[in-house]
Amino acid sequence: MSETTQNEAPVAAQGASQHSNIVGRVTQVRGAVVDVQFEGTLPHILDALHVTFNGQTVVLEVAQEIGEHEVRCIAMDTTDGLMRGTEVVATGGQITVPVGPGTLGRILNVIGEPIDERGPVKSDKRYPIHRKAPSFDEQAAATEILVTGIKVVDLLCPYLKGGKVGLFGGAGVGKTVIIQELINNIAKAHGGVSVFAGVGERTREGNDLYYEMQDAGVIKLGEDTTEGSKVALVYGQMNEPPGARARIALSGLSLAEYFRDEEGQDVLFFVDNIFRFTQAGAEVSALLGRIPSAVGYQPTLATEMGALQERITSTKKGSITSVQAVYVPADDLTDPAPAATFAHLDATTVLNRSIAEMGIYPAVDPLDSTSRSLDPKIVGEEHYQVARDVQRILQTYKSLQDIIAILGMDELSEDDKQVVARARRIQRFLSQPFHVAEVFTGAPGKLVSLEDTVRSFKAIVAGEYDHLPEGAFYMVGSIEEAVAKAEKMKETA
């Protein structure tokens, strides 16, 4: 990929072929879809075109060739005010984004333009947003655990370095808060760079995240520099056209690939929300006139998801560890969008509304959440055994709940009563105060080491803390804090 400067067209690749500077005209505008007619050579599929109207330049991406002289394009910005007959110029290359250290601490849009009002991005290199996945011989197998400091995650569904993690949950169960906590914890403990792609989510949350990152020191803003910043942000929020929302994840991924391939870093790539990527693809697909498949999704759902996910991997140079929030429509995990995402993930962290309703946060379902790294060869025999014991106790409690609801606790055997008591303590101990939620709760956040997590749960499973009240286990870090809380409860009783 040849180098370009910031002053050149924000989209065109330099040294473009005979396909650059071809001029066409708009023949039809249907919302985000624009048809353009050319007299001679047609631009390639996925090429970027520029159309200037009302004093603004909008980028179009070629999606289909619909005739000998006509292409159908997706607009990356609003087409309000665009008229038939307007001149369109082909750039001869794909949409490209600036990459490199200059992007850290900045907010970019889908075509790589800064939207944080801090001037142009200091970068002398650009990557196209559509890139090939690393070849088979370039990839590296990852078996190292990424410690997050969140008890329920580290114990029951540990994340792999260079792996892909899905955060599944319906509306309002806490996906974004967990992502913010992970960015906070891992930026502090891990020290590497992160890229955050805001795909079709609330602009307010994107704004909050930007200021929270400044407060946490993850983004450092100087007079005209962002030196020392650890994260680059790319936003295509829910008020933007479907073209921008369908491509913003690819723009963010190109930024992450630079740090992996050119600088050999272990990069964290956050996507909030991968469902909106699929949703935008469905909107675009319908506008392009494709026949929808199951539940109205695009027929190319699996292909589009695969093209994105296959680029997120570990190579011999570095790794990209991805954490993706997945909105689950109507809490239905069999919906084609979350189901297509499941196939690519190494770990799934499922958030459950019934757990959130009990006031247990993070509302991670300890029985539904899975990880292929929960294996004695990777996490060690002790960790594996403790995790399985915790799940066994919680599963037994779940199966006893119907009996308890009908007959009451008194009808249970002594062994079952003991299991229920321990399960309720474990359930509460899986809750944890978050640093990013301090402003709402007033409770200081806790980052718990993996050793403390395994040791604490091992002791609870063994019955060493059966004498403590259930309330002592709620919203604490390590087991020592639960003991101290029990003492305090005894004093105030």
From Swiss-Prot:
What is the membrane topology listed in the Swiss-Prot or TrEMBL record? Peripheral membrane protein
Annotated EC: 7.1.2.2
Gene3D superfamilies, from UniProt? Answer: 2.40.10.170, Bovine Mitochondrial F1-atpase, Atp Synthase Beta Chain, Chain D, domain 3, P-loop containing nucleotide triphosphate hydrolases
From the Swiss-Prot or TrEMBL record, state where the protein is found: Cell inner membrane
Identify the residues that bind ATP. Answer: 169-176
Gene Ontology cellular-component terms for this entry are: plasma membrane; proton-transporting ATP synthase complex
Q: Give the catalysed reaction(s), semicolon-separated.
A: ATP + H2O + 4 H(+)(in) = ADP + phosphate + 5 H(+)(out)
Listed GO molecular functions?
Answer: ATP binding; ATP hydrolysis activity; proton-transporting ATP synthase activity, rotational mechanism
Q: Which UniProt keywords apply?
A: ATP synthesis, ATP-binding, Cell inner membrane, Cell membrane, CF(1), Hydrogen ion transport, Ion transport, Membrane, Nucleotide-binding, Translocase, Transport
Q: Which SUPFAM superfamilies match?
A: C-terminal domain of alpha and beta subunits of F1 ATP synthase (SSF47917), N-terminal domain of alpha and beta subunits of F1 ATP synthase (SSF50615), P-loop containing nucleoside triphosphate hydrolases (SSF52540)
In UniProt terms, what function does this protein have?
Answer: Produces ATP from ADP in the presence of a proton gradient across the membrane. The catalytic sites are hosted primarily by the beta subunits.
Please give the family membership noted in the entry: Belongs to the ATPase alpha/beta chains family.
Q: What quaternary arrangement does the UniProt entry report?
A: F-type ATPases have 2 components, CF(1) - the catalytic core - and CF(0) - the membrane proton channel. CF(1) has five subunits: alpha(3), beta(3), gamma(1), delta(1), epsilon(1). CF(0) has three main subunits: a(1), b(2) and c(9-12). The alpha and beta chains form an alternating ring which encloses part of the gamma chain. CF(1) is attached to CF(0) by a central stalk formed by the gamma and epsilon chains, while a peripheral stalk is formed by the delta and b chains.
Name of the protein in question: ATP synthase subunit beta
Which gene name does the record give?
A: atpD
